[in-house]
Regions:
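Hydrophobic residues in beta-strands and at strand termini
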Residues: 17-18, 64, 110
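N-terminal "first-domain core" detector
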Residues: 4-43
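HotDog/MaoC-like acyl-thioester-processing domains
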Residues: 7, 11-13, 69-70, 81-146
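Hydrophobic beta-strand-centered segment that forms part of the acyl-chain substrate-binding groove
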Residues: 8, 28, 42-77, 81-89, ...
Length: 146
């Protein structure tokens, strides 16, 4: 199979925070945020690979910097920033109500698997374009050694 080189492009998903998404403090429950976070990262990878062949390996450093409350619209911006032989890493940046400051950010490593759920090559190569892309590429690459 031929290798496909991609440039990181952003995939956006949005969520409305509702009362059932809140914790006992009245802020967005971390578990719900993690669910949406993984889903957003998965969608970025699934735009490149068959979703049937993608599994989540690890969430790296999902850092919360601000809370969200009922009625907030939360935006998940995801992009594939690194690809190994069988692994592929998404970076997810979360903000609310159009604010510039991050609500949550982090990386997720996914693995490309065959029909027997064994890791197999995906033949994707990531070519960073911007300084931010290069920084995210190197950061994601270094996650492999941790």
């Amino acid at each position: 199979m031929e290798t496909k080189t991609i440039c990181p492009t952003c995939t956006v998903t949005m969520r409305l925070v509702k009362s059932e998404d809140l914790n006992h403090h009245g802020t967005l429950f971390a578990g719900r945020t993690a669910e949406w976070f993984v889903e957003s990262g998965f969608i970025a990878v699934a735009s490149l690979l068959n979703p049937q062949n993608i599994v989540c390996l690890k969430i790296h450093g999902m850092f919360f910097t601000k809370p969200a409350v009922s009625g907030d619209v939360v935006k998940f911006s995801s992009k594939v920033v690194f690809a190994g032989n069988t692994s592929i890493v998404s970076y997810i940046h979360v903000e609310k109500n159009g604010a510039e400051k991050s609500l949550v950010e982090g990386f997720i490593t996914f693995i490309h698997v065959d029909e027997n759920n064994k890791p197999c090559p995906h033949y994707i190569n990531v070519s960073p374009v911007t300084e931010e892309d290069r920084y995210l590429y190197e950061t994601a690459k270094n996650l492999r050694t941790k």
